[in-house]
Every structure is written in C-alpha cells, then in structure tokens.
C-alpha cells in the first residue's frame, strides 16, 4: 500500500527528470518503481529544517494534487514522517476565535454572508500564515468558524453592547426606548428654573402651571412687542426694496383742498373744494379725539407707535378707565405731590404707553373697516365725502393706489409712510382714506418732531443698508433727505407723475 503511493508522488514531484532523460523513462517501463528508488545511492541526506510543511501533503485524498514541490524532494527520506503534524490543524478553529470573532461578532447581518466567503474575512495576518501551509480541511474550517461566531442570540447580545458598529435599526430602537425617559422631567425643570430641588414633586408642578398660565395672560407688552418686532425683522430681512412715501399731496389731496390751491391750479370751484377739505378735516379730528386719545397725546407726540412700548408693564386694559386715571398730556398735576404724576415720571410714562398700546389695537382692528368707529350716519357721510373728493381730484387717490397695490403684491418690497402730520392725526387720516391695509401701523412714521432726514435714518437702521430705497414725494424736504442718503427720488406734482410711476413699476424699473 505504501509503495504505490510513493510511486505516484515520485512521478508528480519529478516532472523535469522525465523530460531530460527520455531513455531512462523508456527503460523504467520494464522495471518496477520500487527497485529504481531503492537503487538510488547518490542521495545526500538533508536536515529537517531544509524542508517545510508545504513540501509534504497531508491530504488523505491521493487524487487531489498539491502545490508542486521542489525536484530535490524525495518521499523516501527519514524526516518525512516526523514533519507531518496534524494536531495543530485539529485545534485551529478554537485558536482562530481570538481574531476571527471581532470582525463578525458585532455584525447583525450574519445571515447575509455566504459560508463560502469565510477565507476572505480572515485577518491579513492569518491569511499570510495560511498561504505558506496546506491545510487539509479548509471547508470544514470555514464551517466551524461561522458556527462559532454566529450564535442564535446574536441580535440580543449586540443590542446590549455599546459597540460602534450598531446598525441603524438597532440605534433607532434604542433611541425610541430612551426618548420618553429623557423627556419626562423636562417640563418640570423648565417650569421651576429657580427651584433648588433637582426633581420637584408633582404636587408642586400643578400650582406652578397655574401661575404660568396667569403670567402668560399678564405677559408684558414689552415682550409681545419684542416678539412682533422679531417676526417683522425676519420679514424685513427678506426685503430688497422699500418705497418711502409722503402722504399729503402725494398719495392723497388734503392740504391743498383746505388752502384752495388745488382748486386754483386745476380750475375747480374753490367753495366746493375747500368745503370738502374742511369736512374731511372734521372727521379726522373726530376719530383722533374720540378713539385715538388725541386730546391726551397732542403734546406727547411720538415718531413711531412703539417708541414708548418699553414703559408698558403689560397691565390688562379691558376694564381700565382712561378718563379717570389722572393722566395729563400737557404736564404734571401739582396735586399729586410726587414724581409719579409729573410728566416724564414712571407712572406718567406707563399711562402714556397704555394709550399708545390702545391706539395700536384700535388701528389694527379697524384698518379695513373704519366705519366701525363711526355712527351709521357718519359712515354714510364719509362714503359720500370720499366719492366727492375723488371726483374733484380726478381720481388722484385711485391712481396712486395702483402703484401702492402693485408694490404690496411684491414679496420683496414694502410701503413705508413718512408724514409731517402728527402721528395720531396721521393714523386717523390713513384710516379714513382707506389706506389701513396698505400701511401697517409699524410702517408709519411722523416727522413732526425730528424731520424727514432723521426718519430716513431710523428706517435705514431698521431695514439695513443692503435694501434699495426709493423716495416718492412732492416737497423739498423729501428730496433733500433722499439726497443726503443717496436715495433715488420720484417727484409727484400732477397726475402724469403718478401714471408714469405706475408704468415704471409695471416694467420693473422700480
């Protein structure tokens, strides 16, 4: 049994010998292989260190060829039996768990890896050592390795470890499990920022919640105004162009009606024109005095409605009596005997802020329905008066409204009003002429106290220098202020200027 196997190995391991000596090969056909090997006396013995395990195949199957070995290797040497070591191979699967386990133990996709790819997943150090050896049980090794590395409860083990190789599904499951516990104490912590206890009992959170609700109801107008300012500032940051309008003789005809200059310029009946102007003036002061506290605020004029909002403490004004609070806009009352009643004092400024807050509420409520401030008779009278003025002025306001509405329709543009009229009468005038929807109250400025140029500076500081400003007016004040700030100025002197302005806006020149 040993001799035929040695004969086969000799033929495989000596291919060159048969090529170099053909006559010897022919002669060997008549002789037995065992005799040819035994008569070889020229063999020089070599030490066992000259041979590696790669030269000796330990495979039990003779028909599977090993890697060709050196032609100087002979199976008849005595060291052959001592170099065959099979025990290290038998314990190989247990020894490889130290480096075979880490690449696979943390993976949750074990079922997706085929068994035939086990060798590709062995570390580089192990592959280097395997390449120099010829293991007889590669397939068995791969199967044993996967069986040792993938227990049936691999998902549970991986979920409990804090491995960086967690899958997205497992991470999402862990987040959903921990999220409720992380969010539960948050409301109590936010409600009690000044509480010394880290985790207040639930019995303490209920009264504090009621206190928060009450505090929310009594929230100061300063904070409300700040939030409104923040909301408007976010909208202002998106603006690209701001149109600064004058009111009288630009959008509406009012002052020239009172003086009769309009009737003289356009050949109208002075009596009718002046009478219409006086009637409109009467309505303006009626609304200003009755609903907008002009009697109290005439001597306390402001440039903008929010100028005194910082003095408002947010008191509920539902049942507040403005007629009996002792406020005097012309100066302090000597009967108080303290600084709180003096003009500019804390109490006086607070009452002043109350009035401007109420003015804003009334304006916002009636900006699209000024008739709600008037009796039915006065409402009808206002409608007739506006129609008469529109006829007398040849649709001046209607022509200006075309440009105003076109600008308002643009998302990146805004209309801002700067007038030399005091703030409260200007608000009444805007409401009565039906311009409340065009000009929000925060976009209305009075230049009575500080002048047009200073108003322009405030507007530039609000909207920024990156915005393009276009000034539209009829007077020298607007023109000079526009030149000071390098703003283009569009002069309005007649109907043709309004028509040209609308055409320029339609063609996107402005």
Curated annotation (Swiss-Prot):
InterPro entries: EYA, EYA_dom, EYA_dom_metazoan, EYA_dom_sf
Biased composition (Low complexity): 192-203
Reaction(s) catalysed by this chain's protein: O-phospho-L-tyrosyl-[protein] + H2O = L-tyrosyl-[protein] + phosphate
Compartments in which it is found: Cytoplasm; Nucleus
Annotated segments matching region Disordered: 1-32, 175-233
Comment on bound cofactor: Binds 1 Mg(2+) ion per subunit.
Tissue spec. comment: Expressed in branchial arches, CNS and developing eye.
One BP annotation, GO: response to ionizing radiation
Result of altering residue 473 to A: Abolishes phosphatase activity
Protein family per UniProt: Belongs to the HAD-like hydrolase superfamily. EYA family.
Subunit annotation: Interacts with SIX1 and DACH1, and probably SIX2, SIX4 and SIX5.
Name of the protein in its database record: Protein phosphatase EYA3
Organism classification: Eukaryota, Metazoa, Chordata, Craniata, Vertebrata
The encoding gene: Eya3
């Amino acid at each position: 049994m040993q001799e035929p196997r040695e004969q086969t190995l000799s033929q495989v391991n000596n291919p060159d010998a048969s090529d170099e000596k053909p006559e010897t090969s022919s002669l060997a056909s008549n002789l037995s292989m065992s005799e040819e090997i035994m008569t070889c006396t020229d063999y020089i013995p070599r030490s066992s260190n000259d041979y590696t395990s790669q030269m000796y195949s330990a495979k039990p199957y003779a028909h599977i060829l090993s890697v060709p070995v050196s032609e100087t290797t002979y199976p008849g040497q005595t060291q052959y039996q001592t170099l065959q070591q099979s025990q290290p191979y038998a314990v190989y699967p247990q020894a490889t768990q130290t480096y075979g386990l880490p690449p696979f133990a943390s993976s949750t996709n074990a079922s997706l890896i085929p068994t035939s790819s086990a060798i590709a997943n062995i570390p580089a150090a192990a592959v280097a050592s395997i390449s120099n050896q010829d293991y007889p049980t590669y397939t068995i090794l791969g199967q044993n390795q996967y069986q040792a590395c993938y227990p049936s409860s691999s998902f549970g083990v991986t979920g409990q470890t804090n491995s960086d190789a967690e899958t997205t599904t497992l991470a999402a499951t862990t987040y959903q499990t921990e999220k409720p516990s992380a969010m539960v104490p948050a409301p109590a912590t936010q409600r009690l920022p000044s509480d010394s206890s880290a985790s207040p009992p639930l019995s303490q959170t209920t009264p504090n919640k009621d206190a928060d609700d009450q505090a929310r109801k009594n929230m100061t107008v300063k904070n409300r105004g700040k939030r409104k300012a923040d909301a408007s500032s976010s909208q202002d940051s998106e603006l690209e162009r701001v149109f600064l309008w004058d009111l009288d003789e630009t959008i509406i005809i009012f002052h020239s009606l009172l003086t009769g200059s309009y009737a003289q310029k356009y050949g109208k009946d002075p009596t009718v024109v002046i009478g219409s102007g006086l009637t409109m003036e009467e309505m303006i002061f009626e609304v200003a005095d009755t609903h907008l506290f002009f009697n109290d605020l005439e001597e306390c004029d402001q440039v903008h409605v929010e100028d005194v909002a910082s003095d408002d403490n947010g008191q509920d004004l539902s049942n507040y009596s403005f007629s009996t609070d002792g406020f005097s806009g012309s100066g302090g009352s000597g009967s108080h005997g303290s600084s709180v009643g003096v003009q500019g004092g804390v109490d006086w400024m607070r009452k002043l802020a109350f009035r401007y807050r109420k003015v804003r509420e009334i304006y916002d409520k009636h900006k699209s329905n000024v008739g709600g401030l008037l009796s039915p008779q006065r409402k009808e009278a206002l409608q007739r008066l506006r129609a008469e003025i529109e006829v007398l002025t040849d649709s001046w306001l209607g022509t200006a409204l075309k440009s105003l509405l076109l600008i308002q329709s643009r998302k990146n543009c805004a209309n801002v009003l700067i007038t030399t009229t005091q703030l409260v009468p200007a608000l009444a005038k805007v409401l009565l002429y039906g311009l409340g929807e065009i000009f929000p109250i925060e976009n209305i400025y009075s230049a009575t106290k500080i002048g047009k140029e200073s108003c322009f500076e405030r507007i530039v500081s609000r909207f920024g220098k990156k915005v393009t400003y276009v000034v539209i007016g009829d007077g020298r004040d607007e023109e000079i202020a526009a030149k000071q700030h390098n703003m283009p100025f569009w002069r309005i002197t007649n109907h043709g200027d309004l028509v040209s302005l609308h055409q320029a806006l339609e063609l996107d020149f402005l």
